[in-house]
Swiss-Prot record:
One term under GO cellular component: cytoplasm
Keywords: Apoptosis, Hydrolase, Protease, Thiol protease, Zymogen
Comp. bias regions, Pro residues: 24-49, 56-66
Organism encoding this protein: Aspergillus fumigatus (strain ATCC MYA-4609 / CBS 101355 / FGSC A1100 / Af293)
Gene that specifies this protein: casB
Protein name as annotated: Metacaspase-1B
GO biological process, one term: proteolysis
A Pfam family this chain is assigned to: Peptidase_C14
Family: Belongs to the peptidase C14B family.
Superkingdom as given in the UniProt entry: Eukaryota
InterPro entries assigned to the protein according to its UniProt record, in alphabetical order: Caspase-like_dom_sf, Metacaspase, Pept_C14_caspase
EC number(s) from the headed UniProt entry: 3.4.22.-
Region of interest (Disordered), residue spans: 1-98
Gene3D superfamilies: 3.40.50.12660
Record-annotated active site: 199, 255
């Protein structure tokens, strides 16, 4: 089991919680009422599969390009060159367009205000589907945020399953409370950051907002008792309350995490807003059903058939429902480790286990700190290209000019 920390926190650092002698029992953790007690998990809760296994042999970072980093010119030119620093986000309110109500406006964040971070790493120590790199991910991310972006240690909440303090264990109740703490009293131009490294999965969609008929979920350390956390709930806690101009940057390094916050605007590596192609997806489903039948996997046939029928019946309406109900005037940007249908991988870098997306995100910004959103998406993918099947995703709560400078 890999359980090393490359940059341990300083003595006495408790990740933003009250001093250790005051932590338990807390009068009111995070300065808001405690989250309601969690009941037993719903019937469709299931253990995450044993994914994120190590590749063999362990991969090395992708080779460097000839120049520091080569990006295409904006526009349609096929020539490649090193670009100037991308423009910073505009400060005035922007129109949504793209199918949202005509009166909707959103505002980019200058990220000049207060900074606050919630970092969650779960190795599921002692459980059947134990991971090895998630706690290391959180340790490395906290150091990166502190050194490169000025996040103060006292403004970070760290939840990992190797801690002694009960408030710092990533249980479902602690995670939900910490998510509320993260966005509480956020003001325009504040910069909030959420990082989750652990198991993710899927569960049948109950409110009709998912094109594929499934909600994305994350698994707390006590998921067998308390159940998982659904993307709709995370959206309602962390996205819906935010004011215009508040930035929330999210890194989900988990399986099936493509739309883990239900952000309606998803972008391709060409900077194009993705629209669902139901005909193509239906054809893929049909091929999958035939393959499952040939392998004798009758459950796979059934699941694929259900997905095919749901897409055919409500795909377009789900897309419109998501755009109309999940947009936000705030500035929420998410990089996720894989598409909704993919798993994410652990890797081994710098002498320790790491999550592939967490490692690639930090490495890309250390090497090329002044990238646009589109360049960052492509440089993250370049780090993983040829070594993993997962395809990191970029999504946003509003239409995003992907050629603007990535700020945080």
């Amino acid at each position: 089991m890999y359980h090393r920390h490359s940059a341990p926190p300083p003595p006495g650092w408790s990740g933003g919680y009250p001093p250790r002698q005051q932590q338990w029992p807390p009068p009111q953790p995070y300065e808001y009422p405690p989250y309601p007690p969690q009941g037993p998990p719903p019937a469709h809760t299931f253990p995450p599969p044993a994914h994120r296994d190590y590749p063999s042999p362990y991969p090395t970072p992708p080779p460097h390009s000839p120049s520091p980093y080569q990006h295409p010119h904006h526009g349609h030119s096929q020539s490649w060159s090193v670009p100037a620093v991308p423009p910073r986000p505009p400060l005035e309110a922007q129109q949504f367009g793209n199918g949202a109500p005509s009166h909707y406006r959103f505002q980019y964040s200058a990220c000049t205000g207060r900074r606050r971070a919630l970092l969650i790493g779960i190795n599921y120590i002692g459980q059947p589907n134990q991971l090895r790199g998630c706690i290391n991910d959180v340790t490395n991310m906290s150091t990166f945020l502190h050194e490169r972006y000025g996040y103060r240690r006292e403004d970070m909440v760290i939840l990992t399953d190797d801690q002694k303090n009960p408030l710092s264990i990533p249980t479902k109740a602690n995670i939900l409370r910490a998510m509320q703490w993260l966005v509480k009293d956020a003001q325009p131009n504040d910069s909030l950051f959420l990082h989750f490294s652990g198991h993710g999965g899927r569960t049948p969609d109950l409110d009709g907002d998912e094109e594929d008929g499934y909600d994305d979920v994350i698994y707390p350390v006590d998921y067998r008792v308390a159940g998982h956390i659904v993307d709709d709930e995370m959206h309602n806690i962390m996205v819906r309350p935010l004011r215009p101009g508040v930035r929330l940057t999210v890194i989900f390094d988990s399986c099936h995490s493509g739309t883990a916050l239900d952000l309606p605007y998803v972008y391709s590596t060409q900077g194009i807003l993705k629209e669902p192609n139901l005909a193509k997806e239906a054809a893929q489903d049909l091929f999958s059903a035939i393959s499952s039948y040939g392998k004798g996997d009758l459950s796979g046939v059934a699941m694929t058939a259900i997905g095919f029928l749901k897409k055919a019946a409500k795909g377009d309406s789900a897309r419109q429902r998501t755009v109309m109900t999940k947009t936000s005037p705030a500035d929420v940007v998410m990089f996720s480790g894989s598409k909704d249908t993919q798993t994410s991988a652990d890797t081994f870098q710098d002498g320790e286990a790491r999550g592939a997306l967490s490692w690639a995100f930090i490495k890309s910004l250390k090497q090329w700190p002044n990238q646009s959103y589109l360049q960052l998406l492509n440089s993250i993918r370049a780090q993983l290209d040829g070594k993993y099947t997962q395809k990191p995703q970029l999504s946003c709560s509003h239409p995003l000019d992907v050629n603007l400078l990535f700020v945080m």
